[in-house]
Amino acid sequence: VKTLKVGVCLMAALMLCGCNPLMTASVRNLKSAVIGPDELDVSAAQVAEVKYPQIKLTTPSGSGVLALVREREDLQFWVASGKQVLLLRDGLAVRTIGLGVEGDLDGTRLADNAPFKRGLHQVADGFTSQRWIDLYKGQEVGLIVNSRFSRRATQTLQILDKEYTVLRVDERIDVPAIGLRATNHYWVDPLDGFILQSEQQLTTQLRVRIVQLTPDRRHLP
């Protein structure tokens, strides 16, 4: 069932890539792992030409634009091409396909008290939680991720040609089983907790930056 659902998303992505220069450029850039990162320039006019919500994704191997092609309750499927898929749940990256050179994030399960569902704008300073992740390479399943949240200052964030007032929330994560420690950053709408931009460590080798290019279009048309 999981394979079928992802397959439907990939077909939609191929149609997008075939008719939109920006999406085609995204495919090329995200495949640039051999030669290193290549930043993709995105304009507001290019984004406006695509009716689907879009994000800009930057990885250690490149950057590109992904389109939202499917929603299942709070789970969103963002796709760039036939080999790159990012699944977000309330702004948290929970699975990747074709993004990790040394292996992908294969799954994520959140604790009942995880603050992403109700919004990080409400998280208390020093709040702790857990989640469990599966890694594609190494067959590591159910690794515990301990996290501690810190509220930071309100900032002004510019996305394309617009400015947004956001609250920065940091998440210190610790995955003892693989010796991973890192700090994730989330820039959220202080009114409803929507994550406009984030930097997330997904595996030991895969750190991503996610920017919502269409904050006013959060769901499929």
Give the ranges of each region predicted by the language model.
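Acidic, serine/threonine-rich low-complexity disordered tracts
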Residues: 20-107, 122-221
